[in-house]
Design a protein with these regions (language model features):
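Alpha-helix N-cap/N′ positions at the starts of helices
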Residues: 2, 33, 89-92
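Recognition helix of helix-turn-helix/homeodomain-like DNA-binding domains
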Residues: 26-48, 70
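Interfacial/linker helices and their anchor residues that mediate assembly or domain coupling
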Residues: 73-103
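Short alpha-helical "recognition helix" segments of helix-turn-helix
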Residues: 21-25, 57
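DNA major-groove recognition helix of helix-turn-helix/homeodomain DNA-binding modules
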Residues: 49-67
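A short, Lys/Arg-rich alpha-helix, primarily the initiator
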Residues: 1-16, 23
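Helix-turn-helix DNA-binding elements, focusing on the entry/boundary residues of the two helices
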Residues: 7, 18, 35, 54
Length: 103
């Protein structure tokens, strides 16, 4: 499933209109995202948003933030590469992740 379809399906399960959901998601400056921006996200016309918006979408749509980050194809800030991990440790983490998804 694409990021947009996950957002759209979850919004519909919660019986929210795009306008209602958009009004609940606030940018860093405190203003709401526009319904058009949300529509573009749902139709995969825009790249998934930043962590600030992803966290709010997860909360409003009752999705785990981990799943939403996964379908967005990004990492939460606490997992973003800092360049301090060895290549072997990173490879082991990805192998463990793949094994967990295959179960």
């Amino acid at each position: 499933m694409s990021f947009g379809s996950v957002i759209s399906d979850a919004r519909k399960r919660r019986s929210l209109s795009q306008k209602e959901l958009a009004s609940r998601i606030k940018k860093e400056d405190g203003t709401a995202i526009s319904p058009q921006y949300l529509n573009d996200l749902e139709r995969d016309r825009r790249n998934p948003p930043n962590q600030h918006l992803l966290d709010q979408l997860a909360g409003q749509l009752q999705l785990t933030r981990e799943y939403l980050f996964y379908v967005a194809g990004t990492y939460p800030d606490d997992l973003k590469p800092a360049g301090t991990e060895s290549p072997e440790r990173v490879a082991a983490a990805f192998r463990a992740f793949r094994r967990a998804l295959q179960k």
